[in-house]
Amino acid sequence: MFSLSLNLKTNPLLDNKTHRSSSGIGFRGSTISTVKCSLNNSKDLIVKIRERVKGNVEISPSAYDTAWVAMVPDREYSSQRPRFPECLDWIVKNQNSDGSWGVQSPSMLKHSLSCTLACLLPLHKWNVASPQLLRNGVEFIRSSALAATDKNQISPIGFDIIFPMMIQYANDLNLELPLNQDLVHILFRNREAQLPRNKNLEYVAEGLGNSINWNKVLLMHQRSNGSLFNSPATTAAALIHRHDKKCLEYLNSLLSVYKTWVPTIHPVDVYARLCLVDHLQGLGVYRFFHPEIEDVLQETFRLWQQKDDEIFADTACRAMAFRLLRMQGYPVTPDALGAYVDGESFESSGTDTVLELYKASQVRLPEDDDTLEKLHDWTFKFLKQQLESKTILDQQLLRKVEFNLKNHRGILDAVKHRRNIDLYDIDHIRILKTAYRFPTVYNEDIFLLSAQDFMTNQAQFQKELQMLERWYYDDCRLDDMDFGRNVLRITHFISANMVYDPQLFEARLAFAKLISLTTRLDDFFDHHGSIQEAHLIIELIREWNEPSTITFPSQDVEILYSAVYTTTTDLAEKAYPVQGRCIKSVLIYLWICILTGYKIEMASCTAETLPDIDEYIEIGQASIGVNICVLGFIHFLGVKISEEMVMGEECDKLWKNAASITRLLNDIQTFKKEQEERKINSVIILMNSGLSEEEAVSNILKMVIDKRKELLKLVVRREGSVFPRIVRDAFRKTGNLGFYLYNFTDEFTLPLQMKEDMKLLFHDPPHVHSATSHVT
């Protein structure tokens, strides 16, 4: 099946005499004490996470925004006193020991400078702080001032515009700052250079003072909740310059919730819950939270239909909502992202926002216009340029961008879960105009549950390999054949990525066995067996007699038929308790289909004329092995599947789309080798019709993308399917598997990448990340 793509006779992972594994070799799961794992408290963690999904969103205080709110004067008292004195109290009580305010990190001194100067302004303006507190803050600014122009420091959005203006505000208030004048000149020159380039000046309007038309800003950008951009700082700045009842109501509503401080963005409920859903899915623990996730998505879709500000006024939120809703079959259309197809207007956008747009651009359906393709083109180029220019300072974000671009065609689910656990930072800091933490989304509970669940799977995967080895070496004697590829370890790896739930181990074992057998049979038909032996094996399976009653012409035919017979009988027995019927006849039929496909391919090698592309794809769909492997596998997913469902039109479309993706991607990688061996291949067929190699490959890739869109549409639809989502997902994962296997440029790259992924999945324990330098 998929092994056709591997084609790696020299690959150490495919050694014909691969040694059996010993229990626990290289398995260090027991060392996970570094992340405080206890396999007994998963239920408690699930309960706590469910409460987070349903409860109030947790977000850290923003010293920067609280300071701007503290600067708002009370107009009822002729602006001679603060309108929000409780914010001043918070500032006084929350200075850091080094004199700064805000979240601290060595890589975020610009953020600390911004927060500290912002806090000094209202303290000095209203004359409420002790001289020592002010001196400590001023001293921090003096000692850290050089960081303001350091390109290696992570910069908050709009820092180059806002920070110089706050220096000017300090000067207007007679607050002396011991800053080098050359540095101040550089800051203001940088500010002047940034002003014409920044396409989102209104968002950083607190750094523009009287130079901006505040009435126009309010008219164009004030949201229904009274805020400007859901930003307390910008809203407070508007209220300082223009008395606006809605702005005041917004700030009052904030302080009724947070009492003495404000966050840097509010409201953030929709975005926070979408992030939480995205993490639960990406970390592989979503199966514990199906009702909660569905509730979040239903509410999000309701707001989507209303074009709610909280979604549509936030680019990252809109992109994430589109992706998550579409992947669950909600009717959302790409025109909602049409405003973002012009990449030039996003020069000043954060890399994390562009990454969200990039991920949204990949969820394409057949009926879509070119919006998502255009979005994909510029976001891919933007992110690639960010990597090449080394401008992403946050190492966690850098790894996320690298991971997404490297796997832009597809990634296996379990590998994705494992790598997402590595990327999950419980102390993760996000940054807008200031840095903040998001405990609802990044917390120890989610990490521990993900790590514990992964360790449970990892231990189960180890047991399954030993079970597969007994089947392969003892029950089937497949290693007694002196030809062909032993892909047992790879099929074990592939099966682990088809279903992650440790309880569905029979499904993984079935998938691994079926792929191993199809690979052995394919090698026999392709390189070793004669036409007569190929006919004989098909007839033996059609007649289905006990191996001991048959006189075989060769040991190879005996081993192969006996392996098919024994394995099929065993799978049918194991499927019976769930299915309530014997599936043996279905499996026999599928074996005949795939072997007939092999036979047709053998005959085509000696044919005088090539088939046309449609005829070839029909043959290739059968011979790639998706039908027997996936249609056998889905009987072990814990849901009842009738024979009518398996033989029905929907299933036919599902497996044929998945098979076409795999076959055509295989062809792109192997056509040069197969051309030398005088075999048929879709690329060769198109080149024979007059296309160049480049044109032929491009045409095949377009077919693949179209098939992928068709497959995704069948998988995500919410109505009209006879299969539950877990079954339809098996075909989506099969398509992703094709992209994973054929995402490499040569036969030597593949084993190295796969070997690394196998090590992560089967041996390496997850490690906790807790570093305040991880900022997005």
Swiss-Prot record:
Binding positions for Mg(2+) 3 per the UniProt entry: N666, E674
Lineage top rank: taxon: Eukaryota
This enzyme's EC code(s): 4.2.3.-
Entry comment, domain topic: The Asp-Asp-Xaa-Xaa-Asp/Glu (DDXXD/E) motif is important for the catalytic activity, presumably through binding to Mg(2+).
Family: Belongs to the terpene synthase family.
UniProt motif (DDXXD motif) ranges: 522-526
GO CC annotation terms, alphabetical: chloroplast
Co-factor requirement: Mg(2+)
Transit peptide residues according to the UniProt entry: 1-36
Tissue specificity remark: Barely detected in leaves and germinating seeds.
Binding site for Mg(2+) 1: D522, D526
Cofactor stoichiometry and binding remark: Binds 3 Mg(2+) ions per subunit.
Protein name listed in UniProt: Ent-kaurene synthase-like 1
Location relative to the cell: Plastid, Chloroplast
Keywords from the named record: Chloroplast, Lyase, Magnesium, Metal-binding, Plastid, Transit peptide
Gene3D superfamilies associated with the record: 1.50.10.160, Farnesyl Diphosphate Synthase, Terpene synthase, N-terminal domain
Ligand binding (Mg(2+) 2): D522, D526
